[in-house]
Amino acid sequence: MTRVKRGYVARKRRRSILCQRAGSRGAHSILFRNAQQQNMKAMIYSHEHRKKRKRDFRSLWVTRINAAVREQGLSYNKFIFLLKTHKVLLNRKMLAQIAILDITSFKKLLLVIN
């Protein structure tokens, strides 16, 4: 029988996957097959949540703006409409930061667009 000389490559591949699963508990960090399946699942989750993070932050900004605007007696929808008609170039992230950190500036902005 001839000698197979590819053992190192297979070992390297398995070791790299087991190293990726180093923080896991139980068989997921010890057994190669379980570790490989768990690694695939983890990569799927990380991809999904990278996309989901953007949606989550946008909804957080909208909620913060809505809370700040309602204190001044205006709805979020009306506020965004007024911003667009007055050609104010602040995005929702900036508006949320202003609403939280600098309330006086936010009130001045409301006076400008009303």
From Swiss-Prot:
The record's subcellular locations are:
Plastid, Chloroplast
In alphabetical order, the GO MF annotations are:
rRNA binding; structural constituent of ribosome
GO annotations of cellular component type: chloroplast; ribonucleoprotein complex; ribosome
- What keywords does the record list, in alphabetical order? Chloroplast, Plastid, Ribonucleoprotein, Ribosomal protein, RNA-binding, rRNA-binding
Plastid in keyword set: yes
Task of the protein: Binds directly to 23S ribosomal RNA and is necessary for the in vitro assembly process of the 50S ribosomal subunit. It is not involved in the protein synthesizing functions of that subunit.
HAMAP family from the UniProt entry: Ribosomal_bL20 (MF_00382)
Per the record, the similarity remark reads:
Belongs to the bacterial ribosomal protein bL20 family.
Q: What is this protein called?
A: Large ribosomal subunit protein bL20c
Q: Which organism is it from?
A: Chara vulgaris
